[in-house]
Amino acid sequence: MKEKIAYLGMGIWGFCLASLLANKGYRVVGWARNPDLIAQLQIEKRHPQAPDIPLHPNLSFTTDMEEAVNEASMIVEGVSSAGIRPVSEQLKAITDLKVPFVITSKGIEQHTGLLLSEIVVEIFGNNASQYLGYLSGPSIAREVLKGCPCSVVISAYNPDTLKKIHNAFLTPTFRVYPNSDLKGVALGGALKNIIAIACGISDGFHFGDNAKSGLVTRGLHEIRKFATIMDCRPDTLNGLAGLGDLCTTCFSSLSRNTKFGKLIAQGLTLEQAKAEIGMVVEGAYTALSAYQIAKHHKIDMPITTGIYRVLYENLDIKEGIAALLQRNTKEEYL
């Protein structure tokens, strides 16, 4: 009998990785709360955000989480960062973590400032950390679904867990590189979305590629500074989980965070832009916590601060841009 993997969350990214695992021969059971989405997947055999991609026969769907995780040798989550707490609490009511649990979402929880892995440990207990894994890196779902080459990072505290997850996801076109710095991998994926919103705003004002490259470079500097106070290895952010993911998210026309930034530049409010995108915009969610943590630790993060003030304090977008451009220059420190 084929080895079973449970996948919690059937947005486009969840469907993408669930399809990858199904293509490798695993029996994948995808779960989502939305009964309409599950019914559509079961009946039409297509995902509404990828109607041109046929459903693999190894992939099935359910709204019953217990059915999804029962006898699964691995559990993968692909819900929003805001959804990982309620989903983990629902999972805890069904089972303790005794198999690898792979986080593929990117964000920092609002109000608590917890990384998504820390939320899982808080709910399941410290013993759960040995089963935790984190997958991140430059990976636009549509490109992965089409079989385009892609390189990502997988991290875990336990070497055996790391090996199992690495072997499950690795394919000739989906390159998976191990990295032992789980917190650094998680932070890179979370914070790059804020910088992508800034790049989208820059695009919205037609500032050009020079401005965007400057934002990416200085944005990476902000992310590295943030990582130092979170006990991460700053060099992790020079790799796929940091620079790689940052470049893809900031320069891709498929990036929802960049699209969101363009809408903000056009004068839409936070809620209007989110409604227009129609999907979760993780950078908008994470900006609040990132700003609060940076302020608490007295870290100078001007791009992050600017995005936070525009989104949550109704700062005029042009005033925010002017504040960035009028900052005193100093020795470039990388």
UniProtKB/Swiss-Prot annotation:
Keyword NADP recorded: yes
EC number: 1.1.1.94
Keywords, alphabetical: Cytoplasm, Lipid biosynthesis, Lipid metabolism, NAD, NADP, Nucleotide-binding, Oxidoreductase, Phospholipid biosynthesis, Phospholipid metabolism
Cellular compartment(s): Cytoplasm
GO biological process: carbohydrate metabolic process; glycerol-3-phosphate biosynthetic process; glycerol-3-phosphate catabolic process; glycerophospholipid metabolic process; phospholipid biosynthetic process
Function: Catalyzes the reduction of the glycolytic intermediate dihydroxyacetone phosphate (DHAP) to sn-glycerol 3-phosphate (G3P), the key precursor for phospholipid synthesis.
Name under which the protein is recorded: Glycerol-3-phosphate dehydrogenase [NAD(P)+]
